[in-house]
Amino acid sequence: MYRRILGRPIGRDLPCRGLHLGYGRGVPRVSAFYGVVIYMYWNERDHPVAHFHAYHAGRRASVSADGVLLAGGLESRALGFVQEWASLRHDEIMANWERARKNEPLLAIPPLP
C-alpha cells in the first residue's frame, strides 16, 4: 500500500508518522555528499530535538544533530556517511537549526571530505 503526502508517493518501507516529507521544490537543501542529500525545514521550529532529513537511493530518514536515527531508514553505508557528517558538522547543523527556529535563511554546510 502506498500513501501520498504532498502529492508524492511514499514507499512501503517508510513510516508516515514522525517523518516529514516533501523533498525538492521549496525545501532547503543544506548539503550533499556520496549520493546523500541533506535537507532542513523552517517550519519545524516547534520541534524540541534538533534534526535534519537525509535522502539517499529513494529512502528517507530523520536524523538528530547528534547523528541518531529518529525515523525512516537508510542503507547502513549511507547512514554511516550521514552520522560521520553529523559528527564533523555538529556546530554548523546547530547554527542552521537556530536559524530555522528564527525563520531565517539556512546556510549551506560543507559535505564530507
Locate the predicted segments by residue:
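A short, structured beta-strand/loop element
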Residues: 41-78
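Charge-dense, helix-prone N-terminal extensions
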Residues: 24, 33-39
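Short acidic-hydrophobic surface loop/beta-edge motif
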Residues: 29-33, 54
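C-terminal structural segments of small proteins and small subunits
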Residues: 81-113
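Extreme N-terminal basic, low-complexity initiation segments
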Residues: 1-8
